[in-house]
Amino acid sequence: MRFTAKAASQGLRFAAAAGSALVLAITSFAVESQTAGDPTPYADVHPYFEEPLPQLIKRVPELKHLQPVQSQADLTAILQKTGERVDDFFRHITDLTAREDISLGRLMQERPSSRPELSGERVRDSYLILRHSSKNRSDIIEYRTDAKGDNFDQTVVKRGFIVTSGFALSCNYFSTGFQPESAFRYLGDEQIGSQNTYVVGFAQQPGKATLSVRMQGRSGTPVQMLVQGVAWIDQRNFQIVRLRTDLLAPRWDVGLNQQTTEVTFGKVQLADVPAPLWLPSSVKVHVEFTTHNGNVDEFYELSYRNEHRYSDYQRYRVATKVIP
């Protein structure tokens, strides 16, 4: 089963600095008609789940309490049941609204000897998930609006910060329709709070993947980027309770060194929706750009750290007024 999922606000948007003319956009989880996984940037790239455990923990510190397994015998069953759970989520997802509080951070350093420039803001918006269904497909779109109902993202971008979204849809990598596009490995078991979880690593496969993170610059030419990551899956019900994604490889051609997203999902029971929905409760995003290539005459680093918190999920209904 495949669902088209995209962010109407262009997913991730960012500017190099406040007032800068450079504006890029990343759209997460957009299904393309052509294969998104151009293998050229990923030649000789190996997923980090293939690294020895000590090296993997350095990359993903959340795995420090992992109890590794030696066999992959349970992987097929875990993927099957998790995929069915993800499919069920997309079948039941409906129009939703929530309150979103975001902490925005930007750190810029122009030269190795210069002092880093740190800036930040806290903002609040209305977060919408809207489902548009037709006979043959179902599109799930995210929006953000301010108190006046206007597009929220443009205001933040003009201030030089990055706006990040797409988190409610990120479990799509594990849906039954998209699992063939990735490689998976059962890493072991780990306790997350009171939950015992299966820990599964995944990596999109170049040449097969159609889900992608897409960056678009001033030239208008989009850059397709693939991801790898780790999912923590509740052993009782095969629900993904935490998901981390990283770039499959840095994209030096566009100056993108790192993009890490960590999503924690929480159970939401709406009064008029029979099945509970597992939706983002908190998200951390780190995006890092650099032009440093070993030559001290060319050095520029820019990083963003956003933290999102979601609360008060409700059914979204459009009010109509009949005018005589």
Question: Whereabouts are the PLM-identified features?
Answer:
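N-terminal secretory signal peptides that target proteins for export/translocation
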Residues: M1-G11
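Long, intrinsically disordered, low-complexity accessory segments associated with secretion
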Residues: R2-F3, L24, S33
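Hydrophobic alpha-helical segments and their boundary regions
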Residues: S9-Q10, A17-G19, S71, A183
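Bacterial N-terminal signal peptides
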Residues: R13-T27
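Structured extracytoplasmic
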Residues: E32-Q228, Q235-V241, D246-T260, T264-P324
